[in-house]
Amino acid sequence: MTKRRSTSRGPGRILGILGHPVAHSASPAMHNAAFAAQGMHAMYGAFDVPPSQLEKAIAGIRALGLLGVNVTIPHKEAVMAYLDDVAPTARQVGAVNTIVNRGGRLIGYNTDGWGFLLSLEERGVRVAGRNAVVLGAGGAARAVALHLGMAGVARLTIINRSRQRAEFLAADLARAKTPVRAEVADPGSEEARAALAEAGLVVNCTPLGMEPDTESTPLEDVGLLPAHCVVYDTVYRPLETRLLREARQHGLITVNGLAMLVHQGACAWEYWFGRRGPVDVMRTAALAALEGQP
């Protein structure tokens, strides 16, 4: 990826996260701890922006001279219409999670898939050659699936309740010329069961299992998965979802959503400051913030 240093100037630099709601976001604690550790004169806040106010909020980035922002649910797709430019990867994903203000020109990027791959690399998990299954077809699934396809998985299956959305995603991956052709399966179908039985990596990109509905799961029978399978959940509240708990009880390697949160945040620094954020500091701060929430 091309790394560009922001040209923003001033006595202090203001950044933040746009979403609705964002009160429980761990991003402010994570980034502010990193700024302190690096001796940087910067601050990161949480901006609760209802969808009806999104265009005004984006204009406010220019007017107030913010260095940049992260973008989260429900704005990742809609925000693209209000930016001056969108990086090719973000356009392929169809979502933006990082915005940089370059002298009043707002450019959108997506670091979700990049952070996802780095979090697996950190755990020593090699993606290339694995059979991968992505559960879901929303914004997170799009970023994950694109990067899995580019990283050389042997097989990629998308399982989603809306088959049409899964097929749209598969078609977008084909247009992006990923080396592997994505397959689509309905939950509970024979095709889905066969893909899961041969999976080397399963990634939950749905909100199933997220607080407060912690007993929901995108996969009722973890016993279908082979012993070498890695189970990844992009949900990070709770840190161990029902899916991860059951996978761990079956002896499988598990990775929670905190890893992706931290790494996508550290990758955003590449665009804001021209260097990667301090992962260990960010992880410690994010974990403390999440554990301190009711």
Swiss-Prot record:
Annotated NADP(+) binding sites: G136, A137, G138, G139, A140, T234, G257
Enzyme class: oxidoreductase
Active-site residue numbers: K76 (proton acceptor)
One Pfam assignment: SDH_C
Record-level Gene Ontology MF annotations: NADP binding; shikimate 3-dehydrogenase (NADP+) activity
Keyword Cytoplasm (UniProt): no
Family to which this protein belongs: Belongs to the shikimate dehydrogenase family.
Protein name stated in the entry: Shikimate dehydrogenase (NADP(+))
Organism, scientific name: Symbiobacterium thermophilum (strain DSM 24528 / JCM 14929 / IAM 14863 / T)
Taxonomic path: Bacteria, Bacillati, Bacillota, Clostridia, Eubacteriales
